[in-house]
Amino acid sequence: MTYNQPNNQGFYGQFGGQFVPETLMTAVKELEVAYEDSKKDPVFQAELKELLKDYVGRENPLYFAKRLTEYAGGAKIYLKREDLNHTGAHKINNALGQVLLAKKMGKNKVIAETGAGQHGVATATAAALFGMECTIYMGEEDVKRQSLNVFRMELLGAKVHSVTDGSRVLKDAVNAALRAWVAQVEDTHYVMGSVLGPHPFPQIVRDYQAVIGQEARAQFLEKENKLPDALVACVGGGSNSMGLFYPFVNDESVEMYGVEAAGLGIDTPHHAATITKGRPGVLHGTLMDVLQDENGQILEAFSISAGLDYPGIGPEHSYFNAVGRAKYVDITDEEALEGFKILSRTEGIIPALESSHAIAYAVKLAKELGSEKTMIVCLSGRGDKDVVQVKERLEAEKEVK
């Protein structure tokens, strides 16, 4: 059966929907109409395609990681090189699409939330390109962890709001951005950074990120003359993974692995393993798996990587998990640091800490699958933003002599 989600109410099975105050309902409905129109608009599609090619640098390579494969001692590992995009991660695919859509809707301001700062940088970049006013909401903790990205956003002309509510991380930045959107919905578009939020956001972000899997599928067929046995990608909100997975959803022979952040371990309170440890609940306008206590209070997510410590997961991922289309696994901070070092030393590629979770799991999976099998790993971003943090962490552990 051909996959056909979401339904016309924006649900993926039981997950998804539009759980927003009346004040935002008009805005999400307006966005729905504008997005559907843009899909049929050849001028819009041509402009987006041209920007992805000439500005972002797509298509990026599908690279056979020979030495990483040898290190793992099993399945052939291919890397989809989203780290080579302009701004250094997959986030630009979605930011460009949404800012172009905002322009088409006649909005002159954009706002966005950011965790690691990559989506903030991508949105500020797209806003600069189109001459739009841009405000980014970022948790105070993340502002400290990612000061370089804060400077980048300001350099690109964006205002960065440090959010001091709650645990001062990504979920609090989303809350602040949604509140701000309610107040200025007439002239402002909210650029959602992941496959989260009320419909149509999860679908819009998925569709703009699907370029990852569309390219990877064609590139893999060209190189191997068959489809891969497995796909591996890290999952916070889940946009790079959904971008890789979605174009393969009807290829039943292809297994999909979403790698969540286990932080200090899933049996401690310090992790972000939403599928493993969460249960369905409503957060940020959508019904999805959420980390919550027995009273339904949202728990704090934790990860070494600022881009993965979100207490929810995109509703389509919750659906994939519920119907068994994808498997969700987890990798600890320690394992991710090991992945960070392994890829750097075997391939000369320094990955983002988010992507390092996928690398660490891919090495384990490659051993299990054996040398006859093949896989694609989404290398969602480069590690420049994380080098100082990793340096401090490893020096504290006396690993670097």
Curated annotation (Swiss-Prot):
Its cofactor is pyridoxal 5'-phosphate. It catalyses: (1S,2R)-1-C-(indol-3-yl)glycerol 3-phosphate + L-serine = D-glyceraldehyde 3-phosphate + L-tryptophan + H2O. Its EC number is 4.2.1.20. The keyword Membrane does not apply. One of its GO terms (cellular component) is cytoplasm. The beta subunit is responsible for the synthesis of L-tryptophan from indole and L-serine. HAMAP family: Trp_synth_beta. This is Tryptophan synthase beta chain.
